């Protein structure tokens, strides 16, 4: 059996390891979040002139866009990072959690169709399932499309195609009559490409959601 001294030493080492893990994970997330925000500065004016930024812990950055441009009446960006500061980070990855950029917009008109295109293996996709009416139909594919009608399914196909043309990998693409009307959850964009391309694509997708 371990002596009380050895047990104390072991507990001390474990505590230091946990603190070191927390510090390293926090630093990594803060660095990633700030780097992505710097990258977005070039393209942000395409959707709004000013932004209010809040860090919610070390894993979430909320960016509220002030005075958003048409077709948005309000818009929010969320940088959702993996919990690298927590010891169970590997388990969260097994459950499909990945660094994700989320754009949520309230549109100036209510969409005429409702749909959810989801990656069911992702955190975003599983989180959305409980919000989908059971009466909706499902079409399987690389993204599972939940839709209320044939026009909604057609709209989903057009949105997914446009998103992929823009280099996006959506885990969730949502068009709803309730607010927020429009959402897209994507893997963090490639910062080697211009940020304007990302925000131009978001603008086009929101316009397409209203057609």
Question: Can you describe what each PLM-predicted range is?
Answer:
Residues 6-24:
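Single-pass alpha-helical transmembrane signal-anchor segments
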Residues 24-97:
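N-terminal topogenic membrane-targeting module
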Residues 40-43, 159-162, 205:
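Residues that form generic nucleotide/phosphate-binding pockets
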Residues 71-197:
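Structured extramembrane domains adjacent to transmembrane segments
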Residues 195-210:
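Short amphipathic C-terminal alpha-helix that caps PH/PH-like domains
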């Amino acid at each position: 059996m371990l002596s009380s001294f050895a047990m104390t030493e072991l507990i001390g080492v474990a505590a230091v390891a946990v603190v070191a893990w927390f510090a390293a994970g926090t630093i990594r997330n803060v660095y990633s979040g700030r780097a992505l925000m710097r990258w977005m500065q070039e393209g942000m004016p395409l959707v709004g002139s000013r932004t209010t930024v809040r860090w919610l812990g070390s894993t979430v950055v909320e960016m509220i866009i002030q005075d958003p441009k048409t077709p948005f009446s309000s818009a929010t960006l969320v940088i959702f990072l993996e919990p690298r500061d927590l010891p169970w980070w590997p388990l969260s990855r097994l459950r499909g959690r990945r660094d994700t950029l989320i754009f949520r917009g309230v549109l100036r008109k209510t969409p005429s169709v409702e749909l959810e295109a989801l990656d069911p293996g992702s955190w975003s996709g599983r989180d959305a399932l409980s919000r989908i009416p059971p009466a909706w139909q499902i079409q399987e594919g690389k993204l599972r499309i939940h839709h209320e009608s044939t026009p909604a399914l057609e709209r989903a196909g057009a949105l997914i195609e446009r998103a992929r043309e823009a280099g996006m990998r959506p885990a969730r693409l949502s068009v709803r009559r309730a607010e927020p009307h429009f959402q897209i959850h994507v893997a963090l964009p490639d910062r080697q490409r211009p940020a304007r391309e990302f925000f131009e694509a978001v603008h086009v997708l929101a316009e397409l959601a209203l057609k």
